[in-house]
Each structure stands twice: as structure tokens, then as C-alpha cells.
């Protein structure tokens, strides 16, 4: 509207004779106001006052609903934290019998599971092949692969640390007689 008035005033500046005609046209379209000006001002102000409390109540309702949702979310997070404390870590024990069982163990590693692998049911050549495959997967997934015994290996995801020194120290304190048993018992 202001832009339109600016252009009218610009044209009116150069055309002095038509200014009176424009003012006369504006007067012809205006309606005479029978009511007093004070009464008109009161009626226009009253609806504005009624709309403002409605907006405030909407805002209050929004803030109350947001507070309620926030409270519910906090309760949900608290229950989730309690459940996380209860969850125990498990280690899957696998006895692969052939090389084709290796991808299954890699899938467990992808699911952040720790796997204790016992190669006692595989030939030495297949066990080395399988171990090579698992070592490649471990390096790609940034996991850990530790030797536990002659035929057992522990494959863990990146978020699990293994302190193998305690296991080695425990093996040396048992005595010389236990270290002579290097054969595996087949089940």
C-alpha cells in the first residue's frame, strides 16, 4: 500500500492540476461515519484484546504440553539407563567345523558381540585359513583377536578390551607339570 501511495505522490508532484481530482475521487468513495469516532475505536480495540488471551492460552498450552513431553522423555531415558545397567555382556562360544562357518562369526562381530572360537574340530590347515579370514575382518572392523590357548581365539569388537597378561601370568604360576600337556582332547 505504501508503495502505491509513493507512486501516486510521485505522479502528483509533476501533475499539479490532477491533484484536486484525486482528492475529489477519494472523497467520493469515502462513506460518512455516523457513529462517533470514540465508539469506532473501542470496537476495533476490543476484538484485539480478546484475541491476545487466546494466543496466550495457546502458548501456555503448548508450553505445558512441551513440559509434559520433556518430563515423559526424561522418565523414558531414566528407565533406559536402568535397563542398560541390568544388561550383561555375553560371549558367544563357537566350534567351527569348516571354513564356511567363518562369515557367521564375522556377522556376530558386526553386531558387537564377543566370540570365543575353538578350532579343535577343524584341521590345522582349515583353522589357519579361517583364522586368516577372521583376522582380515578384525582389521577392517577395528576389532581385537587374541590367542587364548593352542586352539582357542577370542574375537572382540573395538569397544571391548582384553587384558591377556593376567591369563598368561595365571598359566605360569600353576607349575611345570601343567605346561607339559600340549595335546588337545577331542570331544
UniProtKB/Swiss-Prot annotation:
Cellular compartment(s): Cytoplasm
Keyword Cytoplasm belongs to the record: yes
Record's keyword terms, sorted: Cell cycle, Cell division, Cytoplasm, Septation
GO biological process, one term: FtsZ-dependent cytokinesis
One Pfam family of this chain: SepF
Origin: domain of life: Bacteria
One GO cellular component term noted in the UniProt record for this chain: cytoplasm
Oligomer status and interactors: Homodimer. Interacts with FtsZ.
Function, as annotated: Cell division protein that is part of the divisome complex and is recruited early to the Z-ring. Probably stimulates Z-ring formation, perhaps through the cross-linking of FtsZ protofilaments. Its function overlaps with FtsA.
Protein family per UniProt: Belongs to the SepF family.
Name the UniProt record assigns to this protein: Cell division protein SepF
UniProt organism field: Streptococcus suis (strain 05ZYH33)
